[in-house]
Amino acid sequence: MSAGKVSIRDFLKKKGKEKITMLTAYDYPTAKIMSMTNLDGILVGDSLSMVVLGYENTLKVSMKEMLVHLDSVVRAKPRQLVVADMPFLSYEVSANTAVKNAGLFVRHGADSVKLEGGEEMADVVRKIVRAGIPVMGHIGLTPQRFLRIGGFRVLGKSKHEEEQLLRDAEVLEEAGIFSLVIENTYADVAKKITEKLKVPTICIGAGPYCDGQILVIHDVLGLSEFTPYFAKAYVNLKEEIQKAVNKYVEEVRESKFPQGENYKERES
């Protein structure tokens, strides 16, 4: 395991060299376990809206809820770079609101923030960066904007979409992002963006050519109700949890638990 706290500079140094690895985390125990691994970054993602809180999309999660989960992750003191997702309407209304909310995340222990959007978000990104807060960009399939782009689909098929994605990436880099998430685009498009930018790119569902990868922890652990085609379950914890719960129920009902080592009695 690598030693020391991962920094923005560490991310930048990995560009074109060693792949960056990121996962989401939303609570203390998960972040604590991750802190003992070689993982580079933790995203406290707005995906918690769906995988933790049970909402149907990412639009429902609030700043208050995001801050509660960020606090939980930060208390674990992970060595990884901690990135906080800015939820829907926490940065789109005005640049001043965006800076204020980004500042709240940093005050609560985030090392940086992530926000969705392309060139239309450049001024917002620029002002957050000028306030001294590192920003991770996010283009491609941006879940907070799924209504506008016509649902969840792979982007970059047409020449127009490809050119827009490239323009988004370049404008965001000029605005000061330190890295860029590319989600659910065609792999060759993500490759072109990666080759074009000086900052590292991190893919989710956009192929192997980026400078790094990020996945939702529930997908990796086999806990999701539905696993996206671009994800991979490295263990089936859902099945293991079911087995453990059923074993507990069985032992309690058959008076096999608790045993002597599980309780104390007064000596007569």
Swiss-Prot record:
It is found in: Cytoplasm. GO terms for cellular component: cytoplasm. GO terms for molecular function: 3-methyl-2-oxobutanoate hydroxymethyltransferase activity; magnesium ion binding. GO terms for biological process: coenzyme A biosynthetic process; pantothenate biosynthetic process. Binds 1 Mg(2+) ion per subunit. It catalyses: 3-methyl-2-oxobutanoate + (6R)-5,10-methylene-5,6,7,8-tetrahydrofolate + H2O = 2-dehydropantoate + (6S)-5,6,7,8-tetrahydrofolate. It comes from the Archaea. Keywords: Coenzyme A biosynthesis, Cytoplasm, Magnesium, Metal-binding, Transferase. InterPro entries: Pantoate_hydroxy_MeTrfase, Pyrv/PenolPyrv_kinase-like_dom, Pyrv_kinase-like_dom_sf. Its EC number is 2.1.2.11. CDD domains: KPHMT-like. 3-methyl-2-oxobutanoate binds at D46, S47, D85, K114. The active site is at E183. Pathway: Cofactor biosynthesis; coenzyme A biosynthesis. Its cofactor is Mg(2+). Pfam families: Pantoate_transf (PF02548). Mg(2+) binds at D46, D85, E116. Catalyzes the reversible reaction in which hydroxymethyl group from 5,10-methylenetetrahydrofolate is transferred onto alpha-ketoisovalerate to form ketopantoate. Belongs to the PanB family. This is 3-methyl-2-oxobutanoate hydroxymethyltransferase. It comes from Sulfolobus acidocaldarius (strain ATCC 33909 / DSM 639 / JCM 8929 / NBRC 15157 / NCIMB 11770). The lineage of its organism: Archaea, Thermoproteota, Thermoprotei, Sulfolobales, Sulfolobaceae. The gene is panB.
